[in-house]
Design a protein with these regions (language model features):
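Alpha-helical segment proximal to the catalytic Tyr-Lys
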Residues: 125, 169-173, 232
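Short C-terminal tail/terminal secondary-structure segment
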Residues: 91-94, 145, 224, 235-248
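Short, flexible catalytic-loop segment of classical short-chain dehydrogenase/reductase
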Residues: 161, 182-193
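Conserved glycine-rich cofactor-binding loop
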Residues: 12-13, 36
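Conserved mid-core segment of classical short-chain dehydrogenase/reductases
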Residues: 68, 91-106, 129, 149-152, ...
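Residue(s) in the substrate-gating loop at a strand-loop-helix junction
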Residues: 140
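Catalytic Tyr-X3-Lys loop
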Residues: 98-117, 132, 136, 160, ...
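Active-site helix of classical SDR
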Residues: 120, 156, 164
Length: 248
């Protein structure tokens, strides 16, 4: 996959950031995206030391004009789009169903579901014309498991997995692959915001058969695989990387 043109949304932190570094180390040309200009430019500068070619393009995945411009600028910069990692996401408001509101639902779904829908729409526009490409969406173990206290987040990730599988079926004949990675608890700011306390994190770890949280690089490695030709026969796959949570 070396020298491929790759776009990563939600690249400024967590899994998206780890994926950007992992893909750059493979020699790929990368465009990283997020909502914060200063942090994005700093990330792109770091990546240039690895990839040689790395650019930051500011975009809010909830806004279609931003997403269209992001994809178009990526293609203008590199001439094509070989892979895309849709990592932008939010944990939403923690708490039971009875404490959720229309606003908390919309805030979570706008980023986690609409953002991926719009990203895939415009990535696929380019990839189908090329008749090649790979998209990897970042879901969650809670995209196929329930979790008390994160109902809206879980529902949004269930939707991501449905979008992934449906899009994969729609475009497979064009030579484009769509898959997802489903992490378990990963050592990120999102996890710390969700668990809130050391006790909360310990309770979550107790649900993981491996008895530890994962590292962003462990998810990034799976993303690199799904982006690459080594996963050429993987279509509509949701790859669980969750320390065994999905095995039970």
């Amino acid at each position: 996959m070396s020298t491929a043109a790759v776009l990563i949304t939600g690249a400024l932190t967590g899994i998206g950031r780890a994926a950007a570094f992992a893909l750059a180390r493979e020699g790929n040309r990368v465009v990283v995206s997020g909502r914060h200009e200063e942090a994005g430019q700093a990330l792109a500068a770091e990546l240039r030391g690895l990839a040689g070619e790395a650019e930051f393009i500011r975009a809010d995945v909830r806004r279609e004009d931003d997403v269209r411009n992001l994809v178009d600028q990526t293609v203008a910069r590199f001439g094509r789009l070989d892979a895309a990692v849709n990592s932008a996401g939010t944990e939403g408001r923690p708490g039971p169903v009875t404490r959720q509101t229309a606003d908390s639902y919309a805030a979570t779904f706008d980023t986690n579901v609409l953002g991926i829908l719009l990203s895939m729409k415009h990535e696929l526009r380019v990839m189908q014309a090329q008749r090649s490409g790979s998209i990897v969406n970042v879901s969650s173990a809670y995209g196929h498991l329930g979790v008390a206290g994160a109902s809206v987040y879980s529902a949004s990730k269930h939707a991501v997995e449905g979008l992934t599988k449906s899009a994969a079926l729609e475009v497979a004949y064009t030579g484009v692959r769509v898959n997802a990675v489903a992490p378990g608890p990963i050592e990120t700011g999102m996890l710390n915001r969700f668990t809130g306390t050391a006790e909360g994190k310990a309770g979550l770890v107790a649900e993981v058969p491996l008895r530890r949280v994962g590292e962003p690089d462990e998810i990034a490695n799976a993303i690199v695989f799904l982006c690459s030709d080594k996963a050429s026969y993987a279509i509509g796959l949701v790859l669980s990387v969750d320390g065994g949570m999905s095995a039970g």
